[in-house]
């Protein structure tokens, strides 16, 4: 007999405890290497999340791979904008689509991720195809990218943690060619507003960003994407098996720009 579905509501507490468990080792490492960072909350938080994500990033990717891998492999083509690739957890997926992809621009403004991202690009055999753009999504014009020059935009658990996500979505839409595809796998606000989770999610979200590098699990990102422009086809769905007891639900699928 399986566990009650309601226990899924407790999953965020388990994940928060995983993150919290990295606080002691972060303090210890900073005492040895950079004690001054202990005096800055932002510096400490950055180091803390970095230590935690060095483990949990791989776990998160493994858990989502069965969903994300076929989504990417089936829908990317031509010139791709990979928004917020971080240290490159998903870069290897583009290697499997090398026959369809001509260029991938990894839009990653955080220089601390670039070394790891380059290593993963080279390991995936994508050197010369995957190019890092060290700017924010709203500054793509500064590196020469033109409107309607991109065939595919990819956002994989990125819009939950970036500042000004609604503005970023609106600024990216013009770069997509007519008939181009926006591929999505993002945390979103629960649709079960009147159930317990509708109150539980915003409560958890009071502390979630602190423990998860600024990630906001209650953004209506799917709604913002729908409103970003004129779409010919919108095929977004909930994560596999997600329902009224999931505090960290997802929206995944594609949006095709009207021709």
Locations of regions flagged by a protein language model:
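A short acidic, Gly/Pro-enriched loop at the edge of an enzyme's catalytic core
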Residues: 138-153
């Amino acid at each position: 007999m399986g566990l009650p579905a309601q226990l899924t509501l407790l999953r965020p507490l388990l994940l928060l405890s995983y993150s919290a468990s990295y606080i002691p080792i972060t303090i210890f490492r900073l005492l040895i290497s950079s004690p001054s960072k202990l005096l800055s909350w932002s510096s400490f938080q950055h180091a803390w999340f970095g230590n935690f994500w060095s483990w949990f990033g791989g776990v998160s990717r493994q858990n989502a791979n069965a969903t994300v891998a076929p989504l990417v492999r089936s829908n990317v083509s031509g010139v791709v904008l990979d928004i917020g690739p971080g240290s490159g957890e998903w870069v290897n997926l583009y290697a499997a689509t090398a026959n369809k992809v001509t260029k991938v621009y990894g839009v990653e403004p955080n220089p601390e991720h670039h070394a790891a991202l380059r290593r993963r690009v080279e390991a995936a055999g994508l050197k010369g195809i995957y190019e890092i753009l060290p700017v924010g999504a709203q500054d793509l014009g500064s590196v020469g990218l033109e409107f309607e020059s991109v065939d595919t935009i990819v956002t994989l658990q990125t819009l939950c943690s970036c500042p000004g996500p609604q503005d970023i979505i609106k600024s990216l839409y013009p770069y997509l060619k007519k008939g181009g595809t926006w591929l999505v796998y993002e945390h979103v606000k629960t649709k079960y507003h009147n159930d317990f989770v509708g109150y539980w999610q915003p409560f958890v979200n009071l502390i979630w960003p602190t423990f998860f590098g600024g990630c906001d699990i209650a953004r209506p990102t799917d709604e913002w994407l729908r409103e970003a422009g004129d779409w010919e086809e919108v095929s977004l769905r909930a994560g596999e098996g997600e329902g009224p007891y999931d505090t960290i639900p997802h929206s995944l699928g594609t949006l095709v720009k009207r021709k």
